[in-house]
A protein has these predicted regions:
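Acidic, surface-exposed loops and disordered segments
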Residues: 1-172
Length: 172
């Protein structure tokens, strides 16, 4: 967990690293493309996000700037950096997913807002170097958290959720 003075230095350095155009090199590859329902959900989420922020579809510069806000943790005062041991392979990442879900549910129960951020996984070498982590610690994602600003436009919408029928197969 990073907060206080430590997060400010980290935020500034990570943002500068991203702004300079460093190519992403995640420990776990990002999807090459999204197809079908995943593509549609991603598109709808993006449209809602940019509409809430007043960014038009044609305004690529503002959209790019908003994307870079990932590397400033969207202004959150804290970030949890989620890593796993290389030796655990994909199952270590699965365990991390379970941890992230529980972390976020616990935070919500305490009135703390959070956002899981895969974008932070773009620069694992930078993060390992910044915090002196060994190379066998593989970076999965970050969770930025703090108290939400209800007046911020980003908090004015919620993404849709898949129905039970879309996400669950019952076998009897």
């Amino acid at each position: 967990l990073v907060g206080g003075a430590a997060i400010e230095g980290f935020r500034d350095r990570l943002y500068a690293h991203a702004v300079q155009g460093s190519p992403p090199k995640p420990d776990f590859p990002f999807p090459l493309r999204y197809e079908g329902v995943y593509r549609e959900r991603r598109k709808v989420c993006g449209v809602q996000l940019y509409q809430a922020l007043g960014i038009s579809r044609e305004d690529r510069a503002s959209a790019a700037q908003q994307s870079l806000e990932n590397f400033r943790f969207f202004g959150a005062p804290h970030v949890a950096l989620i890593t796993t041991e290389d030796e655990l392979g994909v199952y270590g990442a699965v365990d991390c997913g379970l941890y992230v879900s529980n972390f976020m549910l616990a935070a919500q129960n305490l009135g703390v807002a959070s956002i899981a951020q895969a974008a932070l996984a773009s620069y694992p070498d930078f993060i390992r170097d910044h915090f002196g982590l060994p190379p066998n610690r593989k970076f999965v994602c970050g969770i930025s958290f703090g108290y939400a600003d209800p007046a911020h436009p980003i908090n004015s919408y919620r993404t849709a959720r898949a129905t039970e029928g879309e996400s669950t197969t019952w076998i009897e």
